[in-house]
C-alpha cells in the first residue's frame, strides 16, 4: 500500500479575523449550523473525545455532541466506561470536530465536569425507548463472551421495561466540557491553512492567528 502520494488540494475560501465572532461558542454554532445545512451524509455532531488516564495513557473515541451552551459542550455515556474512568482520574480532555468535505476542523481543550442527575435524567427520558433499554443492557467497556450474550441481556431488559417509563440507570450520565481553548481550522491552497486560537481569560477570550 502506497500512501505518500495520496493528497488533495484545498479549494474553499479562507478564514480571516474579521469573519470571526468574538465569542468562540457563537463561532462554533455558526460552523455547526453550516455543516448541518450542508447535509454531508455524516453526523455533524460527531466529535472525537480524547482522554488520558492516571498513568498518562491516552485513548479516544467518537461521541455525539448533545447540547452546547455558554458553559460548554455536553455528551452522555455509561459512567463505568473507560472514558468516564479516565475523566475521574484526569478531567482534562480534548474534543475534535472534523467536517472534511468543508475543509474545516475545530479542536477544543477543556475540563470535563459531571452533569447533575436532573440534567442527565431530562436527556435520558428524551431518548428512544430501545436506546434507553440498551443503556441498561450494556456494561460498557467490559468484556463479554459473545454478541449473543449482549443481545440476550438486551431482550431481558426489554422485557423488564416493556411497560412504563425506563428510569435513568445509576451508572449512566453526562459531562460538560468547559472550554479553555478552541481552535478553528480552515484548509487553504498550498497547505497555508488558516488557524485561529481562542484562549480563555478571566472574563473574555483572546484570539490569535496561528501559523499552519
Swiss-Prot record:
Q: Where does substrate bind?
A: 7-10, 66, 123, 127, 131, 191-193
Quaternary structure, from the entry: Homodimer.
Q: Keyword annotations for this protein?
A: Flavoprotein, FMN, Oxidoreductase, Pyridoxine biosynthesis
Q: Which InterPro entries match?
A: Pyridox_Oxase, Pyridox_Oxase_CS, Pyridox_Oxase_N, Pyridoxamine_oxidase_dimer_C, Split_barrel_FMN-bd
The UniProt entry, under Pfam families, shows:
PNP_phzG_C, PNPOx_N
Which residues are recorded as binding FMN?
Answer: 61-66, 76-77, 82-83, 105, 140-141, 185, 195
Binding note for cofactor: Binds 1 FMN per subunit.
GO process terms (BP): pyridoxine biosynthetic process
Checking SUPFAM superfamilies in the record gives: FMN-binding split barrel
Q: Part of which pathway? A: Cofactor metabolism; pyridoxal 5'-phosphate salvage; pyridoxal 5'-phosphate from pyridoxamine 5'-phosphate: step 1/1; Cofactor metabolism; pyridoxal 5'-phosphate salvage; pyridoxal 5'-phosphate from pyridoxine 5'-phosphate: step 1/1
Q: Which Gene3D superfamilies match?
A: Electron Transport, Fmn-binding Protein, Chain A
Report what the protein is called: Pyridoxine/pyridoxamine 5'-phosphate oxidase
GO function term, MF aspect, one: pyridoxamine phosphate oxidase activity
- Organism listed in the record: Hahella chejuensis (strain KCTC 2396)
Reactions accelerated catalytically: pyridoxamine 5'-phosphate + O2 + H2O = pyridoxal 5'-phosphate + H2O2 + NH4(+); pyridoxine 5'-phosphate + O2 = pyridoxal 5'-phosphate + H2O2
Amino acid at each position: 500500500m502506497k500512501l505518500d502520494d495520496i493528497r488533495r488540494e484545498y479549494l474553499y475560501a479562507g478564514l480571516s479575523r474579521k469573519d470571526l465572532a468574538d465569542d468562540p461558542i457563537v463561532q462554533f454554532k455558526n460552523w455547526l449550523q453550516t455543516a448541518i445545512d450542508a447535509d454531508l451524509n455524516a453526523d455533524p455532531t460527531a466529535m472525537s473525545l480524547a482522554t488520558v488516564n492516571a498513568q498518562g495513557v491516552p485513548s479516544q473515541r467518537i461521541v455525539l455532541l448533545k447540547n452546547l451552551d455558554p458553559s460548554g459542550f455536553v455528551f452522555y455515556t455509561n459512567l463505568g466506561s473507560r472514558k468516564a474512568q479516565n475523566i475521574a482520574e484526569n478531567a482534562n480532555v480534548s474534543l475534535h470536530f472534523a467536517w472534511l468535505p468543508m475543509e474545516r476542523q475545530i479542536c477544543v481543550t477543556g475540563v470535563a465536569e459531571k452533569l447533575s442527575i436532573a440534567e442527565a435524567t431530562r436527556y435520558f427520558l428524551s431518548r428512544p425507548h430501545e436506546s434507553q433499554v440498551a443503556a441498561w443492557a450494556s456494561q460498557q467497556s467490559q468484556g463479554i463472551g459473545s454478541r449473543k450474550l449482549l443481545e440476550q441481556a438486551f431482550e431481558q431488559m426489554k422485557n423488564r421495561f416493556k411497560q412504563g417509563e425506563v428510569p435513568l440507570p445509576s451508572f449512566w450520565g453526562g459531562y460538560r466540557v468547559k472550554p479553555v481553548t478552541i481552535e478553528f481550522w480552515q484548509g487553504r491552497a498550498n497547505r497555508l491553512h488558516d488557524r485561529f486560537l481562542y484562549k480563555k481569560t478571566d472574563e473574555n477570550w483572546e484570539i490569535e492567528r496561528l501559523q499552519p
